[in-house]
Amino acid sequence: MGETVRFGISIDDKLLESFDRLIEQKGYMNRSEAVRDLIRAALVELKWEGGEEETVGTVTLVYNHHVRDLSDKLTEQQHSHHNEIVSALHVHLDAHNCLEVLVVRGKAREVKKIADELIGVKGVKHGKLVMTTTGEELH
């Protein structure tokens, strides 16, 4: 980690009040920690835009397992990306619905593509991709 540098920020008082409430809700010790997290998040998002950054994400799917061939289609998709899908969790939510959480690792562009393919399978009720960094480039 590099040397810590202090700098000032000019900010509207209403925005600062809102920021302070956010800091309290999130449990930050001080404004500096919150600002550092915001900067890191913005830098990670920026790197993903190029699509070449190594990333990891979770793809969450909710679907009715009684829908004809849906489970097989999802399994086929997962097997076609076995190098990128590093883990899968399957949960029976009730007598009809299942939840799958997949951990996917690879270039941002590829992770998004895999998520879109899985979420787009006909019969998936809800799907969401949450991407995060591998942490290698963060300080």
Curated annotation (Swiss-Prot):
Binds 1 nickel ion per subunit. Ni(2+) binds at residues 79, 90, 92, 98. Its cofactor is Ni(2+). SUPFAM superfamilies: ACT-like, Ribbon-helix-helix. GO terms for molecular function: DNA binding; DNA-binding transcription factor activity; nickel cation binding. GO terms for biological process: response to nickel cation. Keywords: DNA-binding, Metal-binding, Nickel, Transcription, Transcription regulation. NCBIfam families: PRK00630.1, PRK01002.1, PRK02967.1, PRK04460.1. Transcriptional regulator. HAMAP family: NikR. Belongs to the transcriptional regulatory CopG/NikR family. This is Putative nickel-responsive regulator. It comes from Geobacter metallireducens (strain ATCC 53774 / DSM 7210 / GS-15).
